[in-house]
Every structure is written in structure tokens, then in C-alpha cells.
UniProtKB/Swiss-Prot annotation:
This is Photosystem II reaction center protein M. The chain crosses the membrane at residues 7-28. Residues 29-36 are cytoplasmic. The keyword Transmembrane applies. Belongs to the PsbM family. PSII is composed of 1 copy each of membrane proteins PsbA, PsbB, PsbC, PsbD, PsbE, PsbF, PsbH, PsbI, PsbJ, PsbK, PsbL, PsbM, PsbT, PsbX, PsbY, PsbZ, Psb30/Ycf12, peripheral proteins PsbO, CyanoQ (PsbQ), PsbU, PsbV and a large number of cofactors. It forms dimeric complexes. Part of a photosystem II (PSII) assembly intermediate complex PSII-I; crystallized from a strain deleted of psbJ, it forms monomeric PSII before addition of the oxygen evolving complex. PSII-I includes 3 assembly factors not found in mature PSII (Psb27, Psb28 and Psb34). PANTHER family: PHOTOSYSTEM II REACTION CENTER PROTEIN M (PTHR35774:SF1). Residues 1-6 are lumenal. NCBIfam families: PS_II_psbM. It is a single-pass membrane protein.
Length: 36
């Protein structure tokens, strides 16, 4: 089975981008709760 490199990159981005976005939101809410 040939691995389509473009498909692999697209899948990695599709998984990583929302994960990073959620982590950033989580860290922001955590820091806001600690400061208040």
C-alpha cells in the first residue's frame, strides 16, 4: 500500500490544528480562572 504523502500531511494537519486550538483555549481559560 503506497502512502500518499500529501494525504498524510493533510490528515496530520486535520488532527493537529483542532487539537492545538483546543489546547490554547484551555490554557487561556485556566489562566483567566487563576487570575480572577
Amino acid at each position: 500500500m503506497e502512502v500518499n504523502q500529501l494525504g498524510l500531511i493533510a490528515t496530520a494537519l486535520f488532527v493537529l490544528v483542532p487539537s492545538v486550538f483546543l489546547i490554547i483555549l484551555y490554557v487561556q481559560t485556566e489562566s483567566q480562572q487563576k487570575s480572577s
